[in-house]
UniProtKB/Swiss-Prot annotation:
Belongs to the bacterial ribosomal protein bL28 family. The gene is rpmB. One of its GO terms (biological process) is translation. The keyword Ribonucleoprotein applies. It comes from the Bacteria. The keyword Metal-binding does not apply. Keywords: Ribonucleoprotein, Ribosomal protein. HAMAP family: Ribosomal_bL28. GO terms for cellular component: ribonucleoprotein complex; ribosome. This is Large ribosomal subunit protein bL28.
Amino acid sequence: MGKKCQLTGKKANNAFAVSHSHRRTHKLQEANLQWKRVWWPQEKRWVKLRLSTKAIKTLEKKGLAAFAREAGINLNQV
């Protein structure tokens, strides 16, 4: 599984690290991804997802079923 949020699709960003002398070197800004076990009440089971921290906050607000429906994800295959 790649370094990508399963619900939002958030992934790493290419960027520059800029030194004091303004030398620019490439760096990768990784998304803040966490493994999270989420209770799925419709199926009465836990689902383990790799989520960004922003997705975790949104998940608490919207709920798992609604968020997965918006993202177009089938939770039975997770």
